[in-house]
């Protein structure tokens, strides 16, 4: 490399500090979780594409959420499983940086898609007469494309700042994958600016969207309480509670990981929390939506019935 930057070539990822038998068990569990993530989100995406009754803005964005969850998990889980099965857990420097970039980008996309989904529920419940104009297919397409493009552009900012740092060791990160705060500890230079940018990005992409979601749902709650029909109120609560569960899991774990004072959460606890945030959320999202959503369950039953008839 040019200039005074020194680059390490390989990075060592720590192994789980457990015996061989438990390591095999963990490998099996993580493989099962990853398989459930692929199957669950794949089924959600497939049902939404195939069932014309689900061709609505809400399920359009839910299909994007399924794509994000599959991409998010596929970014690091296969490498983590490979490291569990091998004696040496290493990753080259630039693939590690790319893993960090994709980790941030997909997390940003999920934040924005969840905000758009809350706006969709707000428009549907609070402004039903204007819903078709507020959430036309053109608007939905623009919101979806903007969420993806903006998220990847935002993830480029910390990536460029990371690549401007010299990396001369140590060669081991104290994390199970290339998480950005752990990667920064490999730099042999002051990372103050990087940490400030990461915190500012967290405020912008976590706190800001979360406030928008909460405001939307306060308005939604007030509108639901005014609904006269018990069936209509139940359906609205069911749909919104599913979305709130996903929002709580995602934003809650992310804010604790990246914005809570580090003294209150030791590094080992943060590793476990980050693992939960990155491994379990993508698996739980389709379960939450399929178990609590009558329309998704109905579409799944129709698909299974059609399969049996053929």
Swiss-Prot record:
<dbReference type="InterPro" id="IPR000725">
    <property type="entry name" value="Olfact_rcpt"/>
</dbReference>
<protein>
    <recommendedName>
        <fullName>Olfactory receptor 2A14</fullName>
    </recommendedName>
</protein>
<feature type="transmembrane region" description="Helical; Name=7">
    <location>
        <begin position="272"/>
        <end position="291"/>
    </location>
</feature>
<keyword id="KW-0675">Receptor</keyword>
<keyword id="KW-0716">Sensory transduction</keyword>
<dbReference type="GO" id="GO:0005886">
    <property type="term" value="C:plasma membrane"/>
</dbReference>
<keyword id="KW-0807">Transducer</keyword>
<keyword id="KW-0325">Glycoprotein</keyword>
<feature type="topological domain" description="Cytoplasmic">
    <location>
        <begin position="292"/>
        <end position="310"/>
    </location>
</feature>
<feature type="glycosylation site" description="N-linked (GlcNAc...) asparagine">
    <location>
        <position position="4"/>
    </location>
</feature>
<feature type="disulfide bond">
    <location>
        <begin position="96"/>
        <end position="188"/>
    </location>
</feature>
<keyword id="KW-0812">Transmembrane</keyword>
<feature type="topological domain" description="Extracellular">
    <location>
        <begin position="259"/>
        <end position="271"/>
    </location>
</feature>
<feature type="topological domain" description="Extracellular">
    <location>
        <begin position="79"/>
        <end position="99"/>
    </location>
</feature>
<comment type="similarity">
    <text>Belongs to the G-protein coupled receptor 1 family.</text>
</comment>
<keyword id="KW-1133">Transmembrane helix</keyword>
<feature type="transmembrane region" description="Helical; Name=1">
    <location>
        <begin position="25"/>
        <end position="48"/>
    </location>
</feature>
<feature type="transmembrane region" description="Helical; Name=3">
    <location>
        <begin position="100"/>
        <end position="119"/>
    </location>
</feature>
<feature type="transmembrane region" description="Helical; Name=4">
    <location>
        <begin position="139"/>
        <end position="157"/>
    </location>
</feature>
<dbReference type="GO" id="GO:0050911">
    <property type="term" value="P:detection of chemical stimulus involved in sensory perception of smell"/>
</dbReference>
<feature type="topological domain" description="Cytoplasmic">
    <location>
        <begin position="120"/>
        <end position="138"/>
    </location>
</feature>
<dbReference type="GO" id="GO:0004930">
    <property type="term" value="F:G protein-coupled receptor activity"/>
</dbReference>
<dbReference type="GO" id="GO:0004984">
    <property type="term" value="F:olfactory receptor activity"/>
</dbReference>
<dbReference type="InterPro" id="IPR000276">
    <property type="entry name" value="GPCR_Rhodpsn"/>
</dbReference>
<feature type="topological domain" description="Cytoplasmic">
    <location>
        <begin position="219"/>
        <end position="235"/>
    </location>
</feature>
<feature type="transmembrane region" description="Helical; Name=2">
    <location>
        <begin position="57"/>
        <end position="78"/>
    </location>
</feature>
<feature type="topological domain" description="Extracellular">
    <location>
        <begin position="158"/>
        <end position="194"/>
    </location>
</feature>
<keyword id="KW-0552">Olfaction</keyword>
<feature type="topological domain" description="Extracellular">
    <location>
        <begin position="1"/>
        <end position="24"/>
    </location>
</feature>
<dbReference type="InterPro" id="IPR017452">
    <property type="entry name" value="GPCR_Rhodpsn_7TM"/>
</dbReference>
<comment type="function">
    <text>Odorant receptor.</text>
</comment>
<keyword id="KW-0297">G-protein coupled receptor</keyword>
<keyword id="KW-1003">Cell membrane</keyword>
<feature type="topological domain" description="Cytoplasmic">
    <location>
        <begin position="49"/>
        <end position="56"/>
    </location>
</feature>
<feature type="transmembrane region" description="Helical; Name=5">
    <location>
        <begin position="195"/>
        <end position="218"/>
    </location>
</feature>
<feature type="transmembrane region" description="Helical; Name=6">
    <location>
        <begin position="236"/>
        <end position="258"/>
    </location>
</feature>
<keyword id="KW-0472">Membrane</keyword>
<dbReference type="Pfam" id="PF13853">
    <property type="entry name" value="7tm_4"/>
</dbReference>
<keyword id="KW-1015">Disulfide bond</keyword>
């Amino acid at each position: 490399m040019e200039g005074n930057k020194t680059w390490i070539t390989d990075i060592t990822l720590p192994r789980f500090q457990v015996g061989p038998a438990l390591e095999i068990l963990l490998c099996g569990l993580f493989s099962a979780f990853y398989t459930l993530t692929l199957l669950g989100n794949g089924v959600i995406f497939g049902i939404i594409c195939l069932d014309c009754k689900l061709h609505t803005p809400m399920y359009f964005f839910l299909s994007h959420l399924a794509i994000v969850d599959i991409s998010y998990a596929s970014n690091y889980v296969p490498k983590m499983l490979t490291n569990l099965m091998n004696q040496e857990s290493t990753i080259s420097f630039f693939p590690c940086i790319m893993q960090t970039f994709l980790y941030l980008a997909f997390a940003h996309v999920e934040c924005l898609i969840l905000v758009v989904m809350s706006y969709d529920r707000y428009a549907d419940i609070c402004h039903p007469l204007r819903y078709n104009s507020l959430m036309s297919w053109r608007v939905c397409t623009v919101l979806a494309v903007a969420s993806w493009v903006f998220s990847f552009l935002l993830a480029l900012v910390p990536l460029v700042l990371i690549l401007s740092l010299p990396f001369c060791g140590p060669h081991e990160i104290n994390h199970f994958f290339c998480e950005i705060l752990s990667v920064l500890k490999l730099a042999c230079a002051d990372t103050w600016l990087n940490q400030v940018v990461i915190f500012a990005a967290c405020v912008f992409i976590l706190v800001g969207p979360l406030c928008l979601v909460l405001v939307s749902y306060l308005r939604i709650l007030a509108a639901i309480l005014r609904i006269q029909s018990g069936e209509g109120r139940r359906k609205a609560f069911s749909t919104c509670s599913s979305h709130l569960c996903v929002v709580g899991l995602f934003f809650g774990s992310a804010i604790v990981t990246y914005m809570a004072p580090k003294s209150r959460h030791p590094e080992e606890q943060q590793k476990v929390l980050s693992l939960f945030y990155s491994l379990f959320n993508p698996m739980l999202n389709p379960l939450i939506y399929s178990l609590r959503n009558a329309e998704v369950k109905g579409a799944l039953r129709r698909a299974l019935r059609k399969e049996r008839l053929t």
